[in-house]
Amino acid sequence: MVKRRTAAVLPNNLPHLQHLVKKDPKSYREEFLQQWNHYETAREIFLVNPSSDISEFCSLIDFISQTCNYYHDVTADFPSELIELLQKNHTIFPFELCEKIVLCLVLLKNKTVISPITLLQCFFPLFRENPTRGVRELLYQQVSLTIRNANKQAKNDKLNKAVQSALFTLVDGSGSGSATHTDYSGQKREYSASELSGVWAVKMVRDLWKRNVWSGDARAVNIMKSAALSSNPKVMLAGIYFFLGADNQEEEEESDDEGPDVSKLLHQANVNKKTKSREAALLRARAVVKKKERGKQNVPTNVNFPALQLLHDPQGFAEELFEKHLASSKSRLSMDQKLVVLRLLTRLVGSHKLTVLGLYSFLMKYLTPHQRDVTQFLACLAQASHEFVPPDALEPLVRKIADEFVTSGVANEVVCAGINAIREVCARAPLAMTPDLLQDLTEYKSSKDKGVMMASRSLITLYREVAPDMLKRKDRGKLASIEMKDRTPLKYGEELNVTHGIQGLELLAQYKAEHGEEGENGDDWDNWEVSEDGQNSDDSGGWIDVDSDDNIELSDSDEEEEKATARKESDEKGSSSQKELVDRMTELASQSILTPNDLKKLEELREQAGVDRLVNGPKRSLKRPDDAVEADEIEGPRKKAKNDREARIASVMEGREGRDKFSSKKAGFNPTSLSNKRKQRNKNFMMIKHKLKGKAGRSLVQKQKVLREHVAREKRKIK
């Protein structure tokens, strides 16, 4: 009886029926079949007349999507019908119906009625065909959410490959034709296929890379590589900005939010007064730190390589970028867009040490002080310089910068930018500089302008490290002059800042040679050396046999010969000690195992050598060749220009707005003086304490007398 009364109201109450079906599917099968027949009838009517009311149809779709998993025999074709309905009629359906069908398909995927690949295969063609922005945004959100959920527990390579293939097709299909669609403002406009789908595909790859779903995935990098070579400017710029920004993404995320300093808060809690608000702040800070630590522990195990390092063919990519966007006469990019392409190209050349010789001749015409954004071009030139670029290709550029920027008749800022640009180029390719030009540029070390002086001295510091023989003798410095004897001249193709073997091992070898082997480990090492080499330990100490004193003849009259002989003996002794140190270092590296004590001592010697280097040597370390160069590094320190009279007056008047005049605050409020009662109230306590003391000691008669006088005064006021 109860069921019959409930069933009487069910056809008009789908949420109630949905609840009952989920509780007891077998008992309400007939009611479900009734709604299924309503759905089929409404679908046929709606296909014939799409302008009819969609509210009832949307309700039926939602109801069947929620309950279809309980009646597989009836609803087996329901997902395919929804997919077909959406794919064939998405351009004529209203947005509300498209949204309902999309959400129902996502619900079916969550109920495992359809697979994620089937869902994505339905959605991706709509990116290219549907002109409605709202539908594309909805599809983008659902596709991105589906991919993130599928990769939450572990990498779903099968799904990722299918999605990346579809995205690659969308990006690579730029120029596959165009179609006329209604603009968002209601006007007709030509949209290419890449404009409709390529931008969304690039946006999705960038978002999934940022969320660490596809970070470090080479296939995602290939998609963005194809986007950077697209003929559509929007897709091209999105792909280029991905490569320019993905390298520093992890560093930016770490530096943006450092979090609270718990040690500082603990110190403040011990010193300051304890209050509830400070205790709550400390608890919140601890909670934030614990949350960050848990986040670091749950980081995915895949390594997030920089996007530029994951390119399959960087040389071919660089050449294609240059030929398509910069060197081609068919390129219609603006100067700002070309500059963005140039930033990526030079970053690619410097990072992978590629050779694109046409790039340097392309940059030649932009290296003038009057060129707009010239510091950007100078930074790009520095990024594109490395050891494997022929000096003949870079030397004309360095000479032109010196002739255009470092000359008389230009501002000090221009000279500073020119010398800084030359320094950045030569830091990566020292052979691009000639000795004559270097010595001319070092003359600016005594300039009165701070920026020019610092730029010139930084150039001197650089060549003290890499090639002190190119500097004048007075500019080499003591340490560089001493090291010149053992330094080999720079050669073309010789890499800079490359550590061979164990860094600082020569320091440990020198320490062991000076102090000897101590302790049991040292004795064991000496015994092992004797048994291995078959030589006496005294002979292995590096002693040099000399002749007896009888064979030495001294001439008091020839002092020059004595000095020459002493200098020769000193050189022989130095070369012998250097050879002994090299042999000792070779033995340590090849025939011994470094103990924990050795490693600890090696670390101490490295730190000490670093301190000595900072005290006695250059203050600036060489930059790595793959470091990016910013325009601010080229401009150098800039002196703030003085304001003219109009600017100073404007600044003064701006500061006066909303401010009272400098005058007494009492003036103008009340022209009359204060009453005696108010003055008495504002007097200092020390001035009236004697009167108050007498007032407190009055007798009852005196108090009555004062009270009668007060009453009489009040009566006189009333009259």
UniProtKB/Swiss-Prot annotation:
One of its GO terms (biological process) is protein transport. It is found in: Nucleus, Nucleolus. GO terms for cellular component: nucleolus; nucleus. It comes from the Eukaryota. The keyword Zinc does not apply. Its main location: nucleus. Residues 563-583, 635-663 have a biased composition (Basic and acidic residues). Residues 519-536, 546-562 have a biased composition (Acidic residues). Keywords: Nucleus, Protein transport, Ribosome biogenesis, Transport. InterPro entries: Sda1, SDA1_C, SDA1_MD, SDA1_N. Pfam families: SDA1_C (PF21638), SDA1_dom (PF05285), SDA1_HEAT (PF08158). Residues 515-583, 614-682 are annotated as: Disordered. Required for 60S pre-ribosomal subunits export to the cytoplasm. May also be required for 60S ribosomal subunit maturation and accumulation. Belongs to the SDA1 family. PANTHER family: HSDA/SDA1-RELATED, PROTEIN SDA1 HOMOLOG. This is Protein sda1.
